[in-house]
UniProtKB/Swiss-Prot annotation:
Identification of the protein by name: Homoserine O-succinyltransferase
Catalysed reactions, semicolon-separated: L-homoserine + succinyl-CoA = O-succinyl-L-homoserine + CoA
Annotated catalytic residues: 142, 235, 237
Residue(s) at site: Important for substrate specificity: 192
Cell compartments where the protein resides: Cytoplasm
Gene: metAS
Enzyme Commission number: 2.3.1.46
Entry-linked Gene3D superfamilies: 3.40.50.880
Family: Belongs to the MetA family.
Length: 309
């Protein structure tokens, strides 16, 4: 799916160098079709890196996807130039009267922070409540999963003693589910989180359907039966070197982190890691766009009543 972005967005050249199909606004305006409108609430500190990762996964299908980037934290960023934020991000007030086909809420490095201590927690609640009436399907990633479970289901924050970091094996529970269509019976995906997602907790306190689990029994992929909300507790969007960057950052900070599991060849941090989850990540996002967004969203977004026959 060619993603439609502003011509000047840095991700355009970055992704083209990777042979990813990106359609700029100037080119897309000549095609007489309605693109899917997808809003990305980017909560990660390194916003440009995160943009590249998610746009890569949204790009591989014949339909257009019109991407809009959202920020809700008005504080000055230490990792992203203010000029970039001003040029390419909108504020919630700019879009609160609009409807969207899809919303992606990224992770955030807030695993050890209590929800009420998060500077933009009221804004997170506001966006999630707004999405119920203004978005066909919302996909939550990693920390955003924990936040959404608290806001939508009242589940308290669940925190691991040690950070889960590495590339883990998962297995699908419902091979005929739309979101896992085409998945291998088992697959690899990265995790980098303090948040804990026991499958039993999801089954006991929500009506969500778990579609894939880790080998240790943690819920990895789950969704509502009406396709309106979906959750992925890992980071299928990560680049090959993202976990390495986090590991060496923590080493330099004197945190004595564990070496990410099943990531560096021969468990040697000096070795170059390989991507073993790219196909899974691409298929997950393609399935979400197709079955959870495109197949149920109305042609006229003024009439939001998504259903799936």
């Amino acid at each position: 799916m060619p993603i439609r972005v502003l011509d000047e967005l840095p991700a355009v050249n970055f992704l083209r160098e990777e042979n990813v199909f990106v359609m700029t606004t100037s080119r897309a305006s000549g095609q007489e079709i309605r693109p899917l409108k997808v809003l990305i609430l980017n909560l990660m500190p390194k916003k440009i890196e995160t943009e590249n990762q998610f746009l890569r996964l949204l790009s591989n299908s014949p339909l257009q996807v019109d991407i809009q980037l959202l920020r809700i934290d008005a504080r000055e960023s230490r990792n992203t130039p203010a000029e970039h934020l001003n040029n390419f991000y909108c504020n919630f007030d700019d879009i609160c009267d609009q409807n969207f086909d899809g919303l992606i809420v990224t992770g955030a490095p807030l695993g050890l922070v209590e929800f009420n201590d998060v500077a933009y927690w009221p804004q997170i609640r506001q966006v999630l409540e707004w999405a119920k009436d203004h978005v066909t399907s919302t996909l939550f990633v990693c920390w955003a999963v924990q936040a959404a479970l608290n806001i939508l289901y009242g589940i308290p924050k669940q925190t691991r003693t040690d950070k889960l970091s590495g590339v883990y094996e998962h297995h699908i529970l419902h091979p005929h589910a739309l979101l896992t269509r085409g998945f291998d019976d088992s697959f690899l995906a990265p995790h980098s989180r303090y948040a804990d997602f026991p499958a039993a907790l999801i089954r006991d306190y929500t009506d969500l359907e778990i579609l894939a689990e880790t080998e240790e029994g943690d819920a990895y992929l789950f969704a509502s039966k009406d396709k309106r909300i979906a959750f992925v507790t890992g980071h299928p969007e990560y680049d090959a070197h993202t976990l390495a960057g986090e590991y060496f950052r923590d080493v330099e900070a004197g945190l004595n982190p564990e070496i990410p599991y099943n990531y560096f060849p021969k468990n040697d941090p000096q070795s170059i890691p390989r991507t073993t989850w790219r196909s899974h990540g691409n298929l997950l996002f393609t399935n979400w766009l197709n079955y959870y967004v495109y197949q149920i969203t109305p042609y006229d977004l003024r009439h939001m009543n998504p259903t799936l026959d």
